[in-house]
Amino acid sequence: MPPILLTFLLFSNVYANFMNMLMGSSSAPLQQYRAYAGCSSSGCVPATIVPKSSGFWPNADMIAGLQTEQRSQNQNQNSNNPQQDDPRTSQSTGQINGNVPGSSSSNQQPVIYIARAGSDKYKNSEVTTSTPTPNGFNFGNGFQGGQNQNTGFSSGFFNNQNQNSNQNLNQNNFQQNQNLGASSGFFNNQNQQNSQQNQVNGPTSGFSNQQTSNQNSGFFNNQNQQNGQNFGNSGNQNGVNPYSGAFSNGQNQNQQGFFGNNQNNQQNSNGQVQGSQNNQIWNQNQNPNILPFGPNLVNSNTQFGPQPFQPIQVGSIRQPFSNKDWNFQPGGQAVQFVGGGGSGGAPGSQSVPMTDEAQQIAVQIQAIRDNLSITRNESNYLINQLKLSLPQELQNQLEMV
């Protein structure tokens, strides 16, 4: 056979295989996708759960699993697959997506998809660095990373981190409260100091004389580091005029504006805000590369720059995982199971013991909660969807997880 003809046939074969792979119709057999197959002897980790629409695939096993799932979405090959209907619960509850055996249509609602997480060579998702990004949704720190504690969006949902010291020398028959760092709106504040020491006992009137420091404003946090506003109908105990009315003679220092820090070091007799340094959207004394809202999914010092707010995207192929997100083994002592019967010293107990399958699902739930590349709301949504897609006996075992 002439060499040029042999080269042409070889090229044709390679091209045909490449096009079949692109079209999802490769004749090469793929390993059967099993949601709860466990780990092989090669040392894989249990299944990892990611949203189907995220576009985030840490390794080739997930891509192969998705291809197999798409090819067999109208077949019920595995009753444990949460993307397919369980005949005991699907028609009565409608909680499981997929196709009931024997039916001709499928409920197309892409929710979640479970795939085996693969070997260690995919541990960092095609990136070489192992340093996690400092920005984004970190638990307890809301819309900013843990290194930013003085900007508007500084703390998480319903998570007070007040470090105030309160010295209340007032004698008020009705209320002796100094509400320091009182939360209002959707975000709480991280107040770090309180310099209000009220030593003047002005005339009280009814339920007035309520001295509130570091008061929140609207939906954003005011992190006032000194004196805030003095509220009340009358009898505000201000050092200038003890008979002042509401909002008068307030000495507002470092009072925040609506979007940024108004660093006001002036004494204001009207109780209004006079921001001498209004930095608008973000603080000048903070990192100028960090936006005060939205997850920064990529380091701001890279070529991609700060990313806009993308609530649907839960990860990036460029973002590495920390090692702890991949070190889960079914029944391992490193995982704390919440619910009876599991290993690792469960803080709670149940009457129904956990089966091996339920323990592996508990490992997946733990992996969702510890994964810093998604938000808490997204992880709670995934966990709820996962539980709803399981048979009822597994839901009972995972009730407290």
From Swiss-Prot:
Tissue: Expressed in the pharyngeal glands.
Region annotation Disordered: where it falls in the sequence: 70-109, 122-303
BP terms from Gene Ontology: nematode pharyngeal gland morphogenesis
Bias type Low complexity, positions: 70-84, 135-181, 188-239, 247-289
Residue stretches of biased makeup (Polar residues): 89-109, 125-134
Domain of life: Eukaryota
Protein name: Prion-like-(Q/N-rich) domain-bearing protein 8
Organism: Caenorhabditis elegans
Gene (UniProt): pqn-8
